């Protein structure tokens, strides 16, 4: 057998031994799963529990590792939620409503979600929505006014902002740019404007 063949065989044997040890020690397997995921990005307790379940870790071993990692500060759902809110509000302009829904899907408890989204005060949320509208309206100049309204409203709706706020900000931005003569702005209060314009993709993806 060649030197490379011996090295390959030795590596395979070591891997087999490691798998055998993990099978005998489920906590070791649980620890390995959690450390691998946490090395890539922060994770919630629920995300790690789900990963261990998929990896065949017994519930008792998974619970023991979750407690140990939480006590060591490696799992901190409150810190995860705060970082999530700050990151995705500033990078994507998501509203409290959308941020809360995302955190809930990631397994964060309601109390921790409330504390995290309260980082954003109402004025900050409105200011972010206004910047989004200004950017969208600037990028759609020259298009029919009804199209501009629909696209701006759809963009805000997908980010979780309520229609009332969306139409108020669109009205204000259009008035500021002198476009109010091109469209009856009273129509912006009508509920039949398509908020989910199919020309635009939804905001998805759940990584910090």
Predicted features along the sequence, with ranges:
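An alpha-helical, amphipathic repeat domain used for nucleic-acid recognition
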Residues: 1-208
């Amino acid at each position: 057998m060649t030197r490379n063949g011996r090295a390959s065989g030795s590596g395979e044997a070591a891997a087999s031994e490691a798998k055998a040890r993990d099978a005998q020690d489920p906590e070791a397997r649980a620890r390995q799963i959690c450390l691998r995921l946490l090395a890539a990005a922060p994770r919630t307790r629920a995300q790690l529990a789900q990963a261990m379940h998929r990896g065949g870790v017994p519930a008792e071993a998974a619970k023991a590792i979750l407690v140990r990692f939480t006590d060591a500060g490696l799992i901190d759902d409150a810190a995860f939620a705060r970082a999530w809110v700050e990151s995705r509000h500033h990078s994507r302009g998501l509203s409290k409503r959308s941020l809360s829904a995302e955190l809930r899907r990631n397994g964060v408890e309601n109390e921790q979600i409330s504390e995290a989204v309260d980082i954003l005060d109402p004025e900050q949320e409105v200011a972010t929505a206004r910047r989004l509208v200004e950017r969208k309206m600037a990028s759609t100049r020259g298009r029919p006014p009804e199209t501009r309204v629909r696209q701006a409203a759809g963009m805000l709706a997908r980010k979780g902002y309520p229609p009332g706020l969306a139409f108020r900000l669109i009205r204000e931005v259009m008035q500021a740019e002198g476009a109010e003569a091109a469209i009856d702005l009273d129509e912006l209060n009508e509920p039949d404007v398509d908020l989910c314009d199919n020309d635009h993709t939804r905001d998805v993806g759940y990584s910090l």
